[in-house]
Structure formats: structure tokens, C-alpha cells
Amino acid sequence: MGVRHPPCSHRLLAVCALVSLATAALLGHILLHDFLLVPRELSGSSPVLEETHPAHQQGASRPGPRDAQAHPGRPRAVPTQCDVPPNSRFDCAPDKAITQEQCEARGCCYIPAKQGLQGAQMGQPWCFFPPSYPSYKLENLSSSEMGYTATLTRTTPTFFPKDILTLRLDVMMETENRLHFTIKDPANRRYEVPLETPHVHSRAPSPLYSVEFSEEPFGVIVRRQLDGRVLLNTTVAPLFFADQFLQLSTSLPSQYITGLAEHLSPLMLSTSWTRITLWNRDLAPTPGANLYGSHPFYLALEDGGSAHGVFLLNSNAMDVVLQPSPALSWRSTGGILDVYIFLGPEPKSVVQQYLDVVGYPFMPPYWGLGFHLCRWGYSSTAITRQVVENMTRAHFPLDVQWNDLDYMDSRRDFTFNKDGFRDFPAMVQELHQGGRRYMMIVDPAISSSGPAGSYRPYDEGLRRGVFITNETGQPLIGKVWPGSTAFPDFTNPTALAWWEDMVAEFHDQVPFDGMWIDMNEPSNFIRGSEDGCPNNELENPPYVPGVVGGTLQAATICASSHQFLSTHYNLHNLYGLTEAIASHRALVKARGTRPFVISRSTFAGHGRYAGHWTGDVWSSWEQLASSVPEILQFNLLGVPLVGADVCGFLGNTSEELCVRWTQLGAFYPFMRNHNSLLSLPQEPYSFSEPAQQAMRKALTLRYALLPHLYTLFHQAHVAGETVARPLFLEFPKDSSTWTVDHQLLWGEALLITPVLQAGKAEVTGYFPLGTWYDLQTVPVEALGSLPPPPAAPREPAIHSEGQWVTLPAPLDTINVHLRAGYIIPLQGPGLTTTESRQQPMALAVALTKGGEARGELFWDDGESLEVLERGAYTQVIFLARNNTIVNELVRVTSEGAGLQLQKVTVLGVATAPQQVLSNGVPVSNFTYSPDTKVLDICVSLLMGEQFLVSWC
């Protein structure tokens, strides 16, 4: 095959011509090098849905040769072309099982596999492409303002209908670390994901990558400039671009790949013939199944610890196939190929570069980081009030009380029943008076079965034309909790205004604080609609990904139903995201404060508007353990506000399981205990006193750490950082961290090692190079209103060379370690964040061997909008060096200026100090333990004023 380097700029055309002639004489094809250096001009943008006009629909008829169904002249593969290593074989029968004769009629090779890989989901293909299989040819490659353009032509049709034989390639060198290319039909506008991405006006002058093109068969090769490593090579298999089947394959530089959520799987995906299906579905987390969200982004680790990422901006139903060579194939059922490559080179940078495209996470209100409690079955305000009272009596923190469907009248949105919930508004007001917040479930499906004039949300929605329609132009009617239902089209601007009105009107009755949006894949209890679905190409595409149920209509609405921007075939995976955007905006309008939305269904960019909970998990040890990689995965995808239902949702928990889940859940960024209708009670107060004490201890620790957690969310919001993160993100050069997914970090500083198995009193975790201090030697409980747990002997520090360590983990303990070199702020825990925010604060200072450490505190009123734009916040940097701790005041306002610092705990003080000074004044109230090397200093300082604490 011929490989082309990008062409020259016009300024150097003459030089290039000489080079070209000489090279052509030797090689028979042209090699051109690009020397274009143009200053980069970027205009920032917010990744929000555009209001665009409908595009060409997949499945529509096309005139001319693209409709060709016969494939005359397709060459048969000869035996020598079929000598392809088994792990490098790309499937020539992705659509169905075929015979040898049918395979060879496609021009492909047929060799039955001797034995599949153990544990493989699919197995190697028997029918596979030979290297000579016809693909597209690159023509008219030229330089552009942003990079390169070219035409791609195919002369031989594929075995899928409606091949698009002429394509346009646009390569955009957007930034030094981001390459973007699209492949689309130049003659007909096709559906593109309506997610606004950054607008760039000129190519990057000094990219970290180089781009090469294979002429025939066409392919793109992307290398890392530093070492020449190939990050993307699409020449490994032929390109397909038919109306309803697009396939792009690439080699991978290693088998260590993560992303492509949402699935129940380890953090690192298996490359042993694994198929990952992206088509959002209401299904309790099950291995190998398509679940609630679709995120077509992966991060790949490379030898030495570098990393890169690839994002296919495509929302159609798709499969992603991983194979052992290693390689990956994208198989989409529509749209265009819109590909971003992020160069990193650090894994952390890859995540930030991805979020530069899809959007940084929203900043949650402070109360949203407290403990949330819910269950399906709180069937009255009396029962709900009793739950809150029981939590208070048992001295458990509780910030947000929730209700499931029970509050509704006939399970209809924006209503409450006048039996058990007749005093619903008063109950919510009482929660507010106690410093708590309230949330309830809101499903997207709107009841359509009542008589006209009986249910305003449907009547008004029908009048405004906000619902998804069927082929007759009438609202598509499915079945969900209230019975017959219509589905709002959140891509319709009219529907956004209608949703805002419905939210505001209900908020006028019941002053709720946040929205729990469920069933928004969208879920449907029947297949398609009450009238079925049409028999057309959108309902029966030539390629159906590996969806549970076997059809695109399974557990959802008809793919051919109509929305404002396009068909549901194209927009299905965006339904949860568009509802999250609508709910985010509606809460801002109704409440005038920071919105808090938790959604089940997600797509790329979701974290900018809402959080996520991982759905209907079972109360099992297996799903407890699986929650860790799930939480880590969503943080890598820019959705840091994520958690699983503590103690599990389906089935009955056990006391031990619920204790261990509460301990882990205390370190979910979003913590909610939620339970199913028929399951045994699992509120913390439902268990024995020893179990309650263990849970109380975990919740106490979470509340003490909330200032640090809030600061991490601020860093995520402004800089694209993760909150909970896998070890490899901080220690990428240590390959032992790459597969660790039963531990997690909070930011850079805290390492959490939970117990995830039954009957265990110890746990083994990996500790990267450095010193790790046991955080539970820091006694902060005395600062707040919660009783301190009983003291237990602890190993004060682990000095690791990068090793596995076995730790004691009795039932009342979760191991949390503070990394040397970091300072974290803590606060006295209360029963609510309203209470805890009034408590004095402490600093935990973890010194390196050189005696240094650094930390940060971000503080505002916890719920106002635009605090950064208005400067209504306090930000403080803490530094330790030479036996001295100081604070640097980045910004101080009334919010945070009066925060009291009452204690400084210094970990790793080698020798007993003779004197401690606070702002130059001797401190008499300090203690030092020669066994633990911990120095405790009682002070009386203000965070918002400069201070200096020293010892000698």
C-alpha cells in the first residue's frame, strides 16, 4: 500500500514539487511533507445541544449507483491472502452467521477456528477480510487552513446496502494535543450529533502528533511525535460507509484500554474478542449487556505510562469490538465518522483534553455531597417523617430525604396523592427548617390515558406539540408506570419551555430541591408502542448491534419515531442527556440556585449538567465490588458526581454487606442508600448496635472530609480533574497500578482500600511509591457534634516502594490513607451539612521525608449560581516546609473569611518538638506521639487571614 504524508503548504509548493518528482521516480507514488506553521486561534465554547434543522435520515432511499445491491466483479480471496494471524482477523460477517460459500462470495476468507480463547465473549471470526479486500482510495489530498482534505472513493460495493461510494475526509489539527477528523457524505447531509464542540480557526503550529495517509486502501495513521509510536492505524481493516453501517478499525498500542461505558465490567476492558454494545437500555446491571448509558470514548495506556484517548462522536446504536492483536473496531448504524484523538501524554491530561471537547462537570451544591436516603415504599409523609426522625435519634447524618413513586397521584409526574401525601408541602418545609433538603423521582413518560382536561402536563404538552410522534404525526404512546404514556421530545425548544413550566408550577406547590430523573433511556414496558412499530429500515436495519432483546425497540420506543432534530433511531442515546439539560435549566429557573440532578441514562457530556447513579444494582458482594470500577469509569468520562445504591437496590442485603457498602459508599462522590419495594429495610438504624456504630463511623469520616471533597469538585469544574480516580491516573509509570480497580483515590491525596468480600477482617491493597499515613489517626470528630468512635491501635504509616500490603480491616473499619506531601482540610461533622458548615476546621498535614506538603480549600455559600464570575468565594493554599505551615490567600470574601481553624495535625514529624508557635505566639496545648510521629496542635486561627504555625 502507498503511504502519503500530508501535503505542503502553498508557500513551499515549489520545494515540495522537486521533492515529489524525485520521490515519485523512486517509489512510484508521491510523498509530501508538511511544514506549515500557523498560529493557533481558538474560540471557547460551551458544549450544549444546538437547535439545528433535521438532517438526512438513515434508511431513506437514495438515487443512483449508491443503491446498488449486486456486487459484480468482487474478487475472491486466494489462499495466500488468507494467511492472517488468528488474533488479527477482522470479521467479514458482522451482520449474521454465514456459510463458507457465502463468506467466499463476499470476497473473504473462511477458516474455522480451532478453539476460542477461554473467557472470550465472542471468539475469533471464521469469516474474515483478506488484506486485499477492496476499500476506499484516497484522492485529491490537499492542505487546508485547519489541516487536510481529501476525497475517498470506492469502486466495489460492500455486502451492506446503500454504500456511499464517494466520501469527504477533513483532518483538523485543532490543538497541540488534539487531532480531529471527519468522514462524511459530501453530497447528502447526514445526521450529526448536536453537541457543540470547540470552534478552532487555524491548525496547531507544533502538534505532539504526526499524520500519515495510506492511499489504497485508504487509512489514517497517527503517531506520537516524541517516539514515533502508532496510536491510530485504520489500515488494519477496510473502511465501511454504507447508509446504515459504518465501520472503522484501528490497531491499539497495548491491551490496556478503559472506557466505552456503561457496562458491568472491570476497569480495564478485555481485548479477548469482546463486543461492547452502546444503545441505552433499562436493565439491571448484567455482564455483557448494554446498560443505561453510552460513552464512545476510550483511554489507552502505552508502554512507559503515556496514554492517549479516542472519542467517536456518534450517537447511533453501535458495537465496539476488541480483539487480541490488539485492535478495536467501531461499528455504527448511522451518522458520520467524527473522531477525536487526544495525545495526553499523561492519562490525567487525556481526560482533561476529552473534557475540553464535551464539557467540564457542573459544580454541585454543597448539600448534595451529604448523605441521601430513599426507598421505594415510603408510602406516606408519616412514614417519611418517621425515617428522618429515626435517623436523627440514632445520630446518623442525613442531608437529603427522597421519595420514589409513592408520592405521586396514580404515578403521574407533577402530582402528589391526597391520601398518604396530603401534607406533602408541609413535610418538605419541615425538612428545610431542620437544615435538610428534599428530592423526588420524576420520570419522562407523561400519562396520556386520562380524559381531556384532567391532567395539565399532558394537555398542555399536547397543545404545544412537545411529544415524540409516530409515523402518522400523532404522539407515540407507550406504557410506563402510569399506564399509557407519551414521551417528551427534549430536543424540541418548545418542550424545554414546557418542561420548565411544569417544574416551576409543581415547585410552587412543593418546594423540592433537586430532581431524580429515572427511566430516561427512555424505558418502555412494551416494545415500541401500543400500536407496534412500522416495518421499515429504521426498525429493521441491516446490522443490529448486540442489544439485549435483539431489536432496537426492545424495552424502548420505536426507532423510526420522530423528534424535532431527527429520528429516534439517531437520537435514542441522547434522550437522558437532553432530559438532564432540560431539568438542569428548569431547576435554575424555578429555584434560582445551583441545580442538582441525578440521572440514570447518560451520554458524552452528561457531567456538565447532572450526576448519575448506577441503576438497579443487586444487594450482592459481586455488585458491591463492581461498583468501584463503575465509579472510576464515570469520573474518567467527566461525570464525577456518581454513586451506586448503598447496600444495593434489588434483593435483601445482609448486615455485613450493608456495613461494608456503607463504608465504601462514604467514598462515592454521590452517596445514597436506596432500596426496592419488596426488600427488607436497610436504613442505617435498622441494624444491630455494632453495625450502626461502624456505619456511623464511616459517615462521620465522610462529613469530616466534605471540605476536601467540595474542593475536589471545584477542581473538576474549573480544570477537568477527576474526583474519584483510579491509581493509574496518579501513578501511570507504575504498571502495577493499571489494573487496580478495587481501590480508589480521592484526588491526589487519599487512598481508599475497602473490604469487598464477605467474612474478611483484613484487606490487601496496592500502595504506590511513597509514604501513606493512616487517616484515622487524625481525631477530628471532637470538632463536631458526632461522638468519636472508640480508638483502635493502628499502624501510623506505610512506607512503600510500590507494593501490595495486607491491612487489618475489622468490621468497623475502612482503610483510608493520606499521601505524604499533601494537606487536606477537615471540618467537625454534624447531622447535616447546614450544621457541619458551622463547625471549626482542622488541617491534616502529611509530610514527605523532606518535610513538605501542599493543599487547598475552596469555599463559597454552597449553592449560589455564578460564584466564580462574581468572585463570591474564598480560596486558600496551604504550604508546609521547614517545620512551618502557612496559608496563601488566593481570594477571600465574606463566604469563608470567618472559618475557624481549631486544630493542625502534622503526620510524619520525626522528632519531638520543644516549642510550637502560632503566628509567633507560643502554643501550650499540643501533643506529640513518638510512636505514631503525629504532632497535634490546638490553635485559634481564621482560614481567611494569613497565619504561620511552626515547631522546633
Swiss-Prot record:
Organism expressing this protein natively: Homo sapiens
Result of altering residue 645 to E: In POMPE; infantile form; most common mutation; deficient in phosphorylation and in proteolytic processing
Pfam families registered for this protein in UniProt: Gal_mutarotas_2 (PF13802), Glyco_hydro_31_2nd (PF01055), Glyco_hydro_31_3rd (PF21365), Trefoil (PF00088)
Entry annotation: catalytic residues: 518 (nucleophile), 521
This protein's name: Lysosomal alpha-glucosidase
EC number(s) reported in the record: 3.2.1.20
Post-translational modification as stated in the protein's UniProt record: The different forms of acid glucosidase are obtained by proteolytic processing.
UniProt lineage: Eukaryota, Metazoa, Chordata, Craniata, Vertebrata
InterPro entries: Gal_mutarotase_sf_dom, Glyco_hydro_31_AS, Glyco_hydro_31_C, Glyco_hydro_31_CS, Glyco_hydro_31_N_dom, Glyco_hydro_31_TIM, Glyco_hydro_b, Glycoside_hydrolase_SF
Keywords: Disease variant, Disulfide bond, Glycogen storage disease, Glycoprotein, Glycosidase, Hydrolase, Lysosome, Membrane, Phosphoprotein, Signal
BP GO annotations: aorta development; cardiac muscle contraction; diaphragm contraction; glucose metabolic process; glycogen catabolic process; glycophagy; heart morphogenesis; locomotory behavior
Cell location: Lysosome; Lysosome membrane
Record annotation: effect of changing residue 615 to R: In POMPE; infantile/adult form
GO cellular component, one term: membrane
PANTHER family registered for this protein in UniProt: ALPHA-GLUCOSIDASE (PTHR22762), LYSOSOMAL ALPHA-GLUCOSIDASE (PTHR22762:SF92)
